[in-house]
Curated annotation (Swiss-Prot):
Residues 107-181 form the POU-specific domain. Residues 1-14 have a biased composition (Polar residues). It holds the Pfam family Pou. Coiled coil: none annotated. PROSITE patterns: HOMEOBOX_2 (PS50071), POU_1 (PS00035), POU_2 (PS00465), POU_3 (PS51179). Belongs to the POU transcription factor family. Class-5 subfamily. CDD domains: homeodomain. It comes from Mus musculus. InterPro entries: HD (IPR001356), Homeodomain-like_sf (IPR009057), Lambda_DNA-bd_dom_sf (IPR010982), POU (IPR013847), POU_dom (IPR000327), POU_domain_TF (IPR050255). Its main location: nucleus. The keyword Cytoplasm does not apply. SMART domains: HOX, POU. Residues 1-24 are annotated as: Disordered. The lineage of its organism: Eukaryota, Metazoa, Chordata, Craniata, Vertebrata. This is POU domain, class 5, transcription factor 2.
Length: 329
């Protein structure tokens, strides 16, 4: 199939070929501040339509732009010619897309209307597909190499950004809208895969933190009372049954093969999973206690840390390091 490749974009001679791994699209910015390139991996043969998109064959070598060399990672490159010649993308290739970085046009009123329409379209499409503003910002980063915060998407939809800033975000958000168009099933599937991977990473990270927090508490109190279990469950936002089963399974595993004294010292040094001021954790089973006014004996005070909201998630700690049982609600 025919494709387009810039006449001044070519592999440097003297370098061996090979695969080129590009995990996410990469922005190549111009020192002339007039334009930029977006590098997107793709599989060919394929068509790179229009004079603003060029197909570059995959290879281990960097590519040379007029006035400088630009590897496939983010870097600076000087301005280049927009002229292009017919060429072929024979196999896997990278699509280099020319992204103009233009100032605001003189017709401000027309731009305001366009931005209003784009903001409404973005909000409508996002809500129709059931995505949060944070989902959109993360997906834009995964797809096009520039992560947008939830606040940025929120202010764009509410048209609370300056016109200049909204104009700068316009190309990215329009590309995202094109990607998730109802006719573009591949783009929608790609969006779902990106968000699912992000959810898995967040869930795994949360599970590791919860397992670590429970392990710290276990080293301080291997056999907590029902009142203590209720307190732990409330602070970690877990079900009491899950906490009770975790402590029961952890007790059956026995002590760690390493020195227990060093483990306890590590727990004291790292602090507690609970937020708020220092709290005395009572150790004597069956004692009535009040965490804010308890005057009995206690071990190391528990100091603040970030709470972890968990709603029915699987609980586990890394089996390679903690060897903790995996629980489910």
């Amino acid at each position: 199939m025919a494709g387009r490749r810039s006449s001044n974009v070519f592999p440097l001679s003297g370098n061996s070929g090979g695969g080129l791994e590009v995990d996410t699209p990469t922005w190549l910015s111009s020192q002339a501040a007039t334009s930029r390139l977006m590098v997107r991996p793709s599989m060919g043969p394929g068509i790179c339509p229009g004079p603003e998109v060029w197909g570059v064959p995959l290879g281990s070598s960097p590519y040379e732009f007029r006035g400088g060399i630009a590897p496939y990672r983010a870097c600076e490159a000087r301005a280049w010619s927009q002229s292009s010649s017919e060429d072929t993308c024979p196999g896997p290739y990278i699509a280099l897309r020319y992204m103009p970085n233009l100032a605001l046009p003189e017709d401000v009123s027309a731009i305001q209307k366009e931005m209003e329409q784009l903001a409404k379209e973005l909000r409508q499409k996002r809500m129709t597909l059931g995505y949060s503003q944070a989902d959109v910002g993360f997906a834009v980063g995964a797809m096009f190499g520039k992560v947008l915060s939830q606040t940025t998407i929120c202010r764009f939809e509410a048209q609370q950004l300056s016109l200049a800033n909204m104009w700068k975000l316009r190309p990215l958000l329009k590309m995202w809208l094109e990607e998730v168009d109802e006719k573009n099933l591949l783009g929608i599937c790609r969006m779902e895969m990106i968000l699912e991977q992000a959810r898995k990473r967040r869930r795994a990270s949360r599970e590791r933190r919860i397992g670590s927090n429970l392990e710290k508490l276990f080293l301080q109190c291997p056999e907590p009372t029902p009142q203590q279990i209720s307190y732990i469950a409330g602070r970690l936002r877990l079900q009491k049954d899950l906490v009770q089963v975790w402590f029961s399974n952890r007790s059956q595993m026995g002590s760690w093969p390493t020195n227990d004294t060093s483990r306890r010292e590590d727990v004291g040094a790292t602090g507690s999973p609970f937020p708020g001021p220092p709290v005395c954790f009572p150790m004597a089973p069956g004692l009535h206690f009040d965490f804010t006014h308890y005057e009995g004996s206690c071990l190391t005070p528990l100091y603040s840390s970030t709470p972890f909201p968990v709603r029915g998630a699987l609980l586990s700690a890394p089996t390679t390091t903690l060897g903790l049982p995996r629980l489910s609600s």
